[in-house]
Amino acid sequence: MGNDTIGSMITCIRNGNLSKAKTVEVPATQITRSIANILLQEGYIANVRERQYNAIRMLVITLKYQTKTRKPHITIIKYISKPGLRVYSNHQDIPQFLGEMGIVILSTSKGIMMHREARAQKVGGEVLCYVW
């Protein structure tokens, strides 16, 4: 998986959606837990649980699909701030998508949060990913 756990998580979710997988497993870190909890709160994924294999902890993310068409709830998930090029934004310049239909996940001094919370608390930070 490499050292870029956020990138690995986003890629696993994207590939799982494309292959219509029921679950995907990503390394359990504080950041991946926070991102998974935000996706769960917003209804983009069905469930998150933690599993341990010997000394390695993994998050098991249950993906969510529409019942009849089996289309994934996450249409697009895009990784923005990469290890080679960090992207930062203050609270006034945080992007919004499709008239608040999607979410922006940021890493701020107050933790990992969505764009709405960051604007309300007037904190900026590193733009991690877009989800819609």
From Swiss-Prot:
GO terms for molecular function: rRNA binding; structural constituent of ribosome. It comes from the Eukaryota. Signal peptide: none annotated. Keywords: Chloroplast, Plastid, Ribonucleoprotein, Ribosomal protein, RNA-binding, rRNA-binding. Belongs to the universal ribosomal protein uS8 family. Part of the 30S ribosomal subunit. This is Small ribosomal subunit protein uS8c. It comes from Zygnema circumcarinatum.
